[in-house]
Amino acid sequence: MSIVALKRLKQYFDLLQNEGSDVEYGDLLTALQEAAADNTNVYLIDKNGKIIAYAADNGFSASAFDEEWIVNQRIPDDLNNSLLKIGAVTVFDGYEAAKMLVAPIVGGSRRIGSLLFAGEDSKFGDEDIIIAEFAATTIGMVISNRLDLMQEDEAQEIKLARSAIKSLSYSEILAMQHIFDELDGNEGLLVASRIADNAGITRSVIVNALRKLASAGVVESRSLGMKGTYLRILNKEIRNEFERQRYPYPKKDG
């Protein structure tokens, strides 16, 4: 990398060094916008065209479409489709008279987004291409690290959810199926006695099931007296795991 590019990226380097994978995308793009050509806005776009973060030149639009993009938080589908076909850092023009520089963002050997520099009066040179290429590589690494952590967290939640379900008896699993069928969203108020009557089970089965899942840390359960029982799901995978191994309800006599 040239000395000029290194100097222009100093703020960007400082952010990466100080924040690492915890750095905010908006802060990175602000640093990139400072390093970019004059009158240029910078966008971080996912593969579906959604704007993850952006940095605008002096807080104003550098081109006619910036305000629309920022309000909608996405770029037009036709432009995004064109960006996804670009496999290397490319400078082009013609989109509403704007000059654009796009750098593909790759993570885990797959395309995960695009880094886009755009402005009607932007003049992109060799240094800008070097900056865009380096930034796309480092941002791809940051995104990949976060995706890996999310997958690890999801795997851990699945493991905890399955372990919690294994602690339940058959009757308690059926009770929780009835509860989740009635629960709208991830939290709500339930009347255990009514659920027990509808399910043909005793209230104690429901109480025991909730106590076990609360002890496992996958739900929060709190009695509100005559009002019922407040339930909040803490583990986002617990409902999916109940559905994955769902038991059919016994047929009622008559």
Describe the role of every protein-language-model region:
Residues 214-224:
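A short, conserved structural fragment
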Residues 171-179:
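Short alpha-helical "packing" element that flanks the helix-turn-helix/winged-helix DNA-binding module
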Residues 195, 209-216:
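Basic amphipathic alpha-helical segments that dock to polyanions
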Residues 169-170, 191, 224-247:
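Short, cationic-aromatic polyanion-contact patches
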Residues 81-146:
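Sensory/regulatory domains in signal-transduction proteins
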Residues 2-11, 17-97:
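Structured interaction and signal-relay segments at domain junctions
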Residues 2-26, 30-31, 35, 119-168:
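Juxtadomain coupling helices with adjacent low-complexity linkers
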Residues 188-199:
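A short alpha-helical element within helix-turn-helix/winged-helix DNA-binding domains
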